[in-house]
């Protein structure tokens, strides 16, 4: 089994505001803002970069959206993510888009100021038979 994760450095403001939040909804909204504000490059956000690690059978992911989730005061939670997998078959001049989703685990390390997002476990691909 293989599982991918990504660690995101956070700001001290985020950690302070998270600790002061009174409800799980407030904490959830703060988490979403922090993940969106810490894009690693100009093209792909943190969730997308985590999803790129998984095998979609020659498909590429697009239109990633966090649909809901929850996070508790201790910094543990989940995010439900929906996305599309786009396939282009050049030889047939044909394309297809499938909808998919993944539940992503969230863990905030208050001491180190980091958020770790973790995808689902998947079977490792077996070698092709000859």
Locate predicted features:
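A short hydrophobic beta-strand element
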Residues: 73-87
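Short, solvent-exposed aromatic-acidic interface loops
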Residues: 117-130
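N-terminal trafficking/processing presequences and adjacent post-cleavage segments
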Residues: 1-56
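Short beta-strand micro-motifs enriched in acidic
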Residues: 107-111
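A short, amphipathic edge element
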Residues: 55-68
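Short, cysteine-centered beta-strand-loop-beta hairpins and adjacent loop/turn segments enriched
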Residues: 84-98
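Residue-level signal for secondary-structure boundary sites
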Residues: 87-89, 112-114, 125
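Beta-strand-rich solenoidal segments
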Residues: 102-104
């Amino acid at each position: 089994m293989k599982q991918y994760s990504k660690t995101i450095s956070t700001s001290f403001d985020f950690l302070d505001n998270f600790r002061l939040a009174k409800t799980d909804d407030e904490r959830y909204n703060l988490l979403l803002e922090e993940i969106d504000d810490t894009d690693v490059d100009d093209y792909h956000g943190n969730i997308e970069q985590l999803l790129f690690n998984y095998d979609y059978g020659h498909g590429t992911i697009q239109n990633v959206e966090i649909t809901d989730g929850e996070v508790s005061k201790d910094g543990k939670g989940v995010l439900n993510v929906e996305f599309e997998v786009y396939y282009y078959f050049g030889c047939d001049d044909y394309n297809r888009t499938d909808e998919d989703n993944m539940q992503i685990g969230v863990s905030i390390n208050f001491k180190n100021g980091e958020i770790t997002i973790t995808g689902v476990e998947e079977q490792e691909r077996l070698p092709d038979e000859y």
